[in-house]
Amino acid sequence: EQTNEILDEPVAKTSADVIVVGGGGAGLAAAAGAAESGASVIIIEAAGFTGGAAMTSGGHMAMLNEEMNAAAERNDEDLYKYLDYQEEDFNEWAPSLTILKQQVTQYLASDQKGRFDSVERMIVDHYIKGKGMDLDGNEVSQDYELVKEALENNWEIFTWLQSGGMEIKDT
């Protein structure tokens, strides 16, 4: 049974197999996964609506899709910047940059049709766009292993979202 009831008053006693705190993209995915496995789920969301940061992103998601890439135009001009990056600036992310540089060099030298993309490109992009400073002035970045795991498995995530009825568009 699914309800979207917003409660103004506390309920005396409610139980579920899984309680998810937060109805953003990650919370909704966790709730959907638990429900698919047969668990009863309660989502607790302070905002009174679901979506979280996923609403402000418009649902954008980095996705490696070879079929869409093959149908697109080559993107040589977008790739040269990766060859200029230095591994020593990438800390634990450096191995992905090294592989990406090899991939880009091979692609640029080839007559391959379609847009270039790779898991390593997405990993490097996550590092570049995700690093910043904390309130104490220390450089911070995303968790490399977590980003790598998610991006290496993004096709499974893609097909899971589609199986749940999400419409995917190339942007």
Residue positions per predicted region:
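Extended, non-globular alpha-helical segments
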Residues: 2-10
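Generic, low-specificity signal for short hydrophobic/alpha-helical stretches with a mild N-terminal bias
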Residues: 2-3, 16, 43, 143
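Conserved N-terminal/central alpha/beta ligand/cofactor-binding core
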Residues: 7, 49-171
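Beta1/beta-strand and adjacent pyrophosphate-binding region of the FAD-binding site
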Residues: 9-26, 42
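Conserved Rossmann-like nucleotide-cofactor binding loop
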Residues: 26-29, 49
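Aromatic pocket-lining residues of Rossmann-like dinucleotide-binding sites
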Residues: 34
